[in-house]
Amino acid sequence: MPNPDNRSDNAEKLQEMVQNTVDNFNEAKETAELSNEKDRAAIEAKNQRRLESIDSLKSEIKDES
């Protein structure tokens, strides 16, 4: 029997995902300051993707509210 589709806490879960992504972004930014040029470029690219994810997650939160 499939599990019921309970979405009552989706906004809360999405907000937690946003906070985790922001935390990871900030930690990576600190790491980038101490990294070589190649690693710094990779970190900056990943952080750009994180910013895009944060925007998408915030949009989903609005949809859930």
Swiss-Prot record:
The keyword Amino-acid biosynthesis does not apply. It comes from the Bacteria. Keywords: Sporulation. It is found in: Spore core. Pfam families: Tlp. One of its GO terms (biological process) is asexual sporulation. Its main location: other. Induction: Expressed only in the forespore compartment of sporulating cells. HAMAP family: Tlp. Belongs to the Tlp family. This is Small, acid-soluble spore protein Tlp. It comes from Bacillus cereus (strain ATCC 14579 / DSM 31 / CCUG 7414 / JCM 2152 / NBRC 15305 / NCIMB 9373 / NCTC 2599 / NRRL B-3711). The gene is tlp.
